[in-house]
């Protein structure tokens, strides 16, 4: 009957009832409330909690961590461990409700502990992070107590906020909860991992094979050459290093170690390649790998491991320290002290080891005992050591009375509280001698403290272009054009030397005209004596030159025979008027007009301006410098640094195909005559990225005298020079660009002298179309250019043997282009050299990818 009545009641109310811990009732009566339900009502009461029970624990079922190997512990890494904090409960007596059953404590008497899942191990821990974890004040349903088997546990815990007296007594006991990762939203991982330092801990690699074997293929022994990973210390043989390390985007690291911090014991070897890598990689690849190993972020020294004046550095402070004009040498993790005023730098408890750049805003304030001094004499608030005191005495500094000195970065010192300096420590040579005796630092040289234009890690690579060629082969013209094109002007001293060379050449050209004039006079006198009548030009009377000009003309011819025309430019102020008067003589003008077509082009250029150039105030223009001969003999070696300006055509390309406008190039002009015996000095240019060899297209029609006094064709002599360059050991495996110069002169020369004049080109027999207007009928000069380039390519292929790399062989290529006197052609040739360098890098990378892919495919099959 009671059950029927209860079903008819629409809104029953809950009847709270005290929880009886010793009762054995069913689940409904064991809860904190006795609740009656209606069919249409929704339960809105408090949460339901199970009665906590102390169940027997199976020890074998307890999850335990694997034992930690001491070899896997990395130096400089500390792991966050938070102690277990018990709940404060001032209302509960010590023995209230605590019972032991079967040796285990009832969970009702324990504290609530929240275990938070983590999967990141940081190199630093925070003591405050354990206080940020909150335990829910309300106990959720039993479904929330289920722990996922894959949920990771953490050792972080915090104290639960205690409840008020009534709630503690009414709600019941607290329970142990395991919070899954999605429930730990209030856990702030930033307290454990600082920005940029979430580097996972790594273990040292374990060798599976015998001692000394490769970690990948388990072959080899202790004497086998191997490459070592700078993170896990794994060692790989020559055949496995590329498979294990891949493209090495962060240097010599295993592919699994990319992104991890390096072993600090290997920091000194960063950027120092091994002999294996030199054989394994090309020069450009090796530079890229070593540069990435030094500059990548993962390999940088952690700032928190550098402690200066009892304060760990931040990333900005470490950047300031490493990029200052004179940074500390071989910086390693440790405690240092730094005198910001004088620049003294040293380890805590030791004397100064270096003088770095002063006034760097890094670290804390220096203390008195940082260098462990015991002299009671202070410099900038630091008690100095005995070796420093001895150095001060040698420098003549009065140290009686335990003074306190204030020393500036330049070495000037004064007593504290005084305005005027007493003297300068480094002005005395005895001070530097004392520093050498007692191993104390001295100020850096002036060149060492000059500020860098850009930080070291931001400096671009410098591509070196070696420019070489035969005498008058056009290499000097290309060098001068490059300076003019890329706005690298000559210095005042160089312009004075160029002016001297141009004026000396001018007297050489004038002597050529005077010699022709004397020869024409003799011919005219012979014709007159034989009764023949000459033309109007030759009928000029021989006494048309007055005695003063005749004497000057004979003087010029005599000095030309003696090879001493260099005496005229210094006296240009006195001789300028005489040269002008001599040049205005009608007989000399008639001789010049008759001789003009046979003179060299640059001689005609300067003789047309003889009145201007012969003056003492003459200043050579860019075109004068370009037309001048003999500048290659001005110095055996000259170089110019430049960068290519961006063109509108390049700017229209996508960013992936654009060149870096900040990339620097160095054009080195080398005269072969300055290389010494057996070209020993050529070893200085082993780091050249590209060799530009210049050949004049008109050399086939000229003859020169070789070292033995024999007359040989100049093109054959250039061919021999090219062979010697290509086969020289210092230029092995270098890319060559053949630049055929003087193409504009070839168009004139080939009409007068056929190309088959040179015996090397005797098989030149181009097909000539009958239709001269056809676009498929190129000019003879263009045909000759392609033929000469083809001959040099055949010669290049016959000299060099195939190069073997990673099991494949390939033939090096000879690149060819043409230039003339126009500046555009020189600019195109140098930009072509830039493209060759880029192609070489991309081609090598693609070749490596293909090689690695084929090897991996064969190994997997």
Curated annotation (Swiss-Prot):
GO biological process, one term: G protein-coupled receptor signaling pathway
Domain G-alpha, first and last residues per copy: 461-853
Chain positions recorded as GTP binding sites: 469-477, 624-632, 741-744
Region described as G5 motif: 818-823
CDD domains linked: G-alpha
Necessary cofactors: Ca(2+)
Compositional bias ranges of the Low complexity kind: 146-156
Chain span(s) of sequence motif Nuclear localization signal: 204-211
Subcellular location: Nucleus
Binding site for Ca(2+): 476, 632
Main location: nucleus
Residue ranges of the region described as G3 motif: 665-674
Gene null: resulting phenotype: No visible phenotype. Enhanced susceptibility to P.syringae.
Any coiled-coil regions, as ranges: none
Induction (UniProt): By bacterial pathogen P.syringae.
MF terms (GO), sorted A to Z: G-protein beta/gamma-subunit complex binding; GTP binding; GTPase activity; zinc ion binding
Keyword GTP-binding: yes
ZnF bounds (RING-type): 214-257
Keyword set, alphabetical order: Calcium, GTP-binding, Metal-binding, Nucleotide-binding, Nucleus, Plant defense, Transducer, Zinc, Zinc-finger
Positions of region (Disordered): 1-32, 121-168, 523-545
Family named by the database record: Belongs to the G-alpha family. XLG subfamily.
Miscellaneous remark of the record: Dark-grown xlg1-1 xlg2-1 xlg3-1 triple mutant plants showed markedly increased primary root length compared with wild-type plants. Dark-grown roots of the xlg triple mutants also showed altered sensitivity to sugars, abscisic acid (ABA) hyposensitivity and ethylene hypersensitivity, whereas seed germination in xlg triple mutants was hypersensitive to osmotic stress and ABA.
Subunit structure: Interacts with GB1. Component of a G-protein complex at least composed of XLG2 and GB1. Interacts with RTV1.
Record's function text: Guanine nucleotide-binding proteins (G proteins) are involved as modulators or transducers in various transmembrane signaling systems. Binds GTP with specificity. Plays a role in the root morphogenesis by regulation of the cell proliferation. Acts as a positive regulator in resistance to pathogen that triggers the salicylic acid (SA) pathway. Promotes the DNA binding activity of RTV1 specifically to promoter regions of FT and SOC1 in vivo leading to the activation of floral integrator genes.
Name of the protein in its database record: Extra-large guanine nucleotide-binding protein 2
